[in-house]
Amino acid sequence: MKATEARLLDFLKRSQQFVIPIYQRTYSWTEQQCRQLWDDIIRAGKRDDISAHFIGSVVYIEQGLYQVSGISPLLVIDGQQRLTTAMLLIEALSRHLGEDEVFDGFSAMKLRNYYLLNPYESGEKGFKLLLTETDKDSLLALIKQRPMPENYSHRIMENFTFFDEQIAKLGDDLIPLCRGLAKLLIVDVALNRGQDNPQLIFESMNSTGKALSQADLVRNFILMGLEPEHQTRLYEDHWRPMEVAFGQQGYSEYFDSFMRHYLGNDSNLLIVFYVQIMPDDFVMQLHRF
């Protein structure tokens, strides 16, 4: 593991692409958390005595073997909420800027090409951040500035709208926002493939953050230890249909109740052993339940 201090914008600029693994929970920040970040950014931007504002860590591991000649996706173990929220704010700000820089490095084109896009790549490789299925198409639609998909992510749209409205209230006085964004600081934590245990690190990092739901914990426990292709197959064939069936609004509440009911049955007392030796059978049985 290697941990270094980094400015968020510098970190985004030099990184090619972040991918959120399918075992991660969906984007879950509320307006309250976005408002707190907004207030912190504006405060830092207005005060010369604040040189930096720390917003947390971003922990990642290379998805596969590093390739100099192409995009090398980084799997995000911790920091999805911060990365996604920052990109929603940057996208909203880019729509209020022209081609002239209002502050060093802050023009519509530079914000998009530095922090949101890989402008010389095509398809999904052309985007800095790929979220999980529930959120991915919504974020990409915003960045492409196209209509939202039919089953769009409410969190993505609501938080983007919040930032867009806050920026509109600033009028032409955008320099404090730009200065504040430039002061955001993270801890850049790169894991070593084959040496660090992503599951243990994920669990320890989330022990002090927003509590994971029962469904999130079970999904992570099942999928995180599997090979990527195995993860994808189980998620797309069985877990994703359950998420869709419960819907975005009811996922946490009703899916959690469902999981507690299912795992509370006497017939499931050996659930941990069952999941470890037969994850496919467990997920398929859960899907049919």
What do the PLM-derived regions correspond to, one by one?
Residues 2-17, 116-143, 174-176:
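Short, compositionally biased low-complexity segments
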Residues 29-34, 50-51, 81-82, 152-160:
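Phosphate/oxyanion-binding active-site loops and adjacent basic polyanion-contact surfaces
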Residues 47-48, 96-100, 208-212:
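Secondary-structure transition/capping motifs at alpha-helix termini
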Residues 53, 97-125, 129:
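Flexible phosphate/Mg2+-sensing switch loops adjacent to catalytic phosphate-binding sites
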Residues 58, 63-80, 119-152:
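Aromatic/His-enriched, Gly/Pro-containing loop or helix-boundary segments
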Residues 130-289:
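Polyanionic (Asp/Glu-rich) segments that form extended negatively charged tracts
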